[in-house]
Regions:
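Intrinsic-disorder-associated, low-complexity terminal segments enriched in Asp/Asn/His/Tyr and depleted
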Residues: 5-6, 15, 24, 33
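Flexible, acidic/Gly-rich N-terminal and inter-domain linker regions that tether
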Residues: 31-137
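Canonical Radical SAM [4Fe-4S] cluster-binding loop centered on the CxxxCxxC motif
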Residues: 132-183
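Conserved AdoMet/S-adenosylmethionine-binding subsite of the radical SAM
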Residues: 180-189, 193-343
Length: 343
């Protein structure tokens, strides 16, 4: 399973997605009357959902029923929730909403890789990708509109950061994919095609940590989507102080976008390295692996010709892992140039 997941991650990084002009259209300034806006149920944890149901005068068990309709059956229309009374369904419609991102464009490649361009209520857009592998596959989801990291090799890095995604917007991406592949009600782990999630789309997950944690806890909840935590990988460009916290709060797999064997090279291609040096990242990874439920770490390494791809660089990487005694895998990624990338 891990080998197939690892290959899916590698394959994901070789695809060029939508042009910058298509992804970011800058409509976040649209005015929305927050006083009349309905509560988005996919923004709520199970406890928060229960509290809202109690507020409208219903019993707490109704929250469990609603949770299963949303996350086990994938229903967005309250009228389809057949075990709820008509009066309750009307009450839910007046107070709440269950929203999916709007599909603006989609593309399926010859190898069945499926790409979506999704739009949220304020007009902002993100990318999502499904990468199939035999009888399973990984869905790559985004956590921010744009990205503040500015990695020189990254297409998203050429866009300005606009905002964090909400909990519902993060979850909504995966639910769009499940709509597309008919995976409602939630299938078992053995037969699901959307078997893995990789949190390595647009944005830096650790800079939207609270929303990402909440979204992943909902996605892995046993009474809903019920995706195993071992089938979720969160990738970071190296926000060292938050690595241990992120892993402790989610229990998912860790991937680190390393891309260089030393600080000199990494700072050239990843500005974040001037703030969090390789040594600090490695120490955080080592601290994480001291934990009882730690897993192998994947280090993502994009091969840039003449910059980080020599035999000496490979030896440096080996010595780096030995120094910090890390249990890790390297994901070697061929670079797929995009217009204006400079490589």
């Amino acid at each position: 399973m891990w080998k197939e997941h690892h290959l899916a991650v590698q394959k994901l990084k070789t695809h060029i997605l939508w042009p910058v002009s298509a992804v970011h259209i800058g409509q976040s300034a649209q005015n929305v009357n927050k006083m009349t806006e309905k509560i988005e149920l996919t923004d709520l944890s199970k406890d928060e959902l229960t509290a809202e149901i109690l507020k409208i005068g219903e019993k707490s068990f109704r929250a469990k029923q609603l949770w299963q309709w949303i996350y086990f059956r994938g229903v967005t229309d309250f009228n389809e929730m057949s075990n709820l009374s008509l009066s309750l369904r009307q009450k839910l419609q007046e107070t709440f909403t269950i929203t999916r991102p709007k599909i603006v464009a989609e593309q399926i490649s010859i190898d069945k890789t499926h790409k979506w361009l999704l739009e949220f209520k304020d007009g902002e857009r993100v990318e999502m990708v499904y990468i199939p592998e035999k009888d399973r596959g990984a869905v790559c989801i985004s956590t921010q509109v744009g990205c503040a990291m500015g990695c020189r090799f990254c297409h998203t890095g050429s866009q300005k950061f606009t905002r964090n995604l909400t909990v519902g917007e993060i979850i909504g991406q995966f639910m769009v994919a499940r709509d597309a592949y008919g995976e409602w009600p939630s299938p078992t782990d053995e037969i699901r095609y959307l078997s893995n999630i990789v949190v390595m789309g647009m944005g830096e997950p650790l800079n939207n940590l609270d929303n990402v944690v909440k979204a992943l806890n909902i996605i892995t909840d046993n009474e809903g989507i019920a995706l195993s935590r071992r089938r979720v990988t969160m990738s970071t460009s190296g926000i060292a102080p938050r690595i241990v916290e992120a892993m402790q709060r989610t229990g998912v797999r860790l991937a680190v976008s390393l891309h260089a064997p030393n600080n000199a090279i990494r700072s050239q291609i990843m500005p974040i390295n001037d703030k969090f040096r390789i040594e600090e990242i490695m120490k955080a990874c080592a601290e994480y692996q001291k934990g009882e439920h730690s897993r192998y770490i994947t280090f993502e390494y994009l091969l840039l010709k003449g910059i980080n791809d020599s035999l000496d660089h490979a030896k440096e990487l080996i010595n780096l892992l030995k120094k910090y005694r890390l249990r890790a895998l390297f994901n070697l990624i061929p670079f797929n140039p995009w217009p204006g990338c400079g490589f």
